């Protein structure tokens, strides 16, 4: 978050591991980043590592990024050849309005935008989130909830919905159980309507079209 608190971060990672919590490390792929030491640390701690291409949001506008393909090539020079980690997924293919066939397809592991690779000299998986050079908007299944209760639909735009207004709505003449049920229904309806209008794609390649002005530390993850 722009502070020199490395010791606190490392202590926090260790504490989380000791508590048995699942831990992974996300690192922004900046041009001046030395990824080797970070990979060695993650390997030593047995923690999955993911590299995220820098996006022109907030402080990201001030830095020069590089593609994850370039970074992966750099890591191969140090840790051997890499291979995408996939699994066989069963998928249905429509032949006609009455006939379907079932076939298998190799797809990347995980349910998000990261594509994971196994390097021959590493035991940990290394993931790459390539928002710029591997645009994955058509399969994006992510929204963000800010600390202010605002549901963001895309990092590129300020579009979304303020869930606080719904939570603070007055429900009178009902018992607490019915009030909670009514609020849940309102939240579900509002979130579905907002997500249905999620932008088709980001516009990071055209920063002048961006409408989001907040820093990532305010947006959250």
Feature roles, as predicted:
Residues 1-52:
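Radical SAM/AdoMet-radical enzyme domain recognition
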Residues 44, 54-57, 61-221:
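Auxiliary Fe-S-binding modules of radical SAM enzymes
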